[in-house]
């Protein structure tokens, strides 16, 4: 059996010692079935690539899994301490860090072919409408803590930046969908759907169903949720859920901050082989 475990929003930047966090320990300290192959999807907000904690985490998990698919989240780019760095600096550090571990595959608008299945990875971001842009740019930390180089100066990113990245990500996914001859599992940080009270499908806590900030967390990609996609795994909303949409598994498994109770399950997984059989 090929087992794909999936987690997100570990926020190692706020954890002093990963060895003392039992939920994290279960990601590397568990009994493996010798007949199974284990993969791990890290769906963003894992940690700051300039901190020691994420490298120590990688040292723990790298020997355990055959492949680890790592999609950066928005928090990977946060400037919490000086010296402040641009998003390009963070991307370079992410690339260099992952290159130290041959089985950790950094995926941001990338595709990985694994035998009879393909994985697409993308931070994804989201599209912020003009009507919500003023509120979201003030209330969401991305627009205060993520920096870019503009005219040789370090400055805050804008709604226009994240909207552009979102368009690029969706275009990349659409292009891969057109060319794919294999079933696809898509891995993103931002959610592919908004919560739906009528269907009872929640990609975030139902208490946020009418939040003015929803566009910073969700996309409405319902029109592209078709074959050959067989599963879409994501993070970002600090909520854990799993449901079927148009025959596709939509699932998330998020740890979140220490004061939150998000029903995180370090053993959550998808059976890749069974998923392929179900989609014959």
Curated annotation (Swiss-Prot):
Gene3D superfamilies reported for this sequence: 3.60.21.10
Alphabetized GO MF terms: hydrolase activity
Protein name from the UniProt record: Uncharacterized protein L509
Native species: Acanthamoeba polyphaga mimivirus
């Amino acid at each position: 059996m090929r087992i794909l475990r999936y987690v997100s929003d570990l926020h190692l930047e706020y954890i002093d010692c990963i060895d003392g966090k039992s939920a994290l320990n279960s990601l590397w300290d568990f009994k493996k079935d010798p007949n199974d192959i284990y993969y791990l999807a890290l769906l963003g907000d894992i940690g700051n690539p300039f901190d020691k904690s994420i490298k120590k985490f990688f040292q723990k998990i790298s020997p355990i899994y055959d492949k680890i698919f790592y999609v950066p989240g928005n928090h990977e780019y946060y400037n919490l301490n000086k010296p402040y760095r641009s998003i390009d600096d963070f991307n370079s550090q992410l690339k260099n860090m992952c290159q130290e571990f041959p089985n950790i595959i950094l995926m941001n608008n990338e595709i990985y072919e694994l035998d009879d299945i393909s994985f697409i990875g993308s931070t994804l971001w989201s599209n912020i409408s003009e009507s919500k842009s003023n509120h979201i740019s003030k209330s969401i930390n991305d627009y205060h803590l993520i920096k870019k180089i503009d005219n040789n100066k370090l400055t805050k990113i804008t709604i226009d930046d994240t909207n552009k990245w979102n368009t690029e990500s969706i275009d990349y996914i659409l292009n891969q969908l057109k060319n794919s001859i294999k079933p696809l599992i898509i891995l993103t940080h931002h959610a592919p759907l908004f919560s739906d009270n009528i269907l009872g499908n929640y990609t975030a806590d139902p208490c946020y169903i009418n939040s003015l900030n929803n566009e910073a967390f969700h996309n409405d990609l319902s029109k592209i949720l078709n074959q050959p996609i067989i599963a879409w795994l994501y993070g970002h909303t600090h909520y854990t859920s799993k449901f079927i949409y148009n025959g596709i598994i939509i699932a998330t498994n998020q740890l979140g901050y220490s004061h939150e109770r998000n029903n995180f399950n370090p053993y959550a997984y998808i059976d890749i082989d069974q998923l392929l059989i179900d989609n014959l």
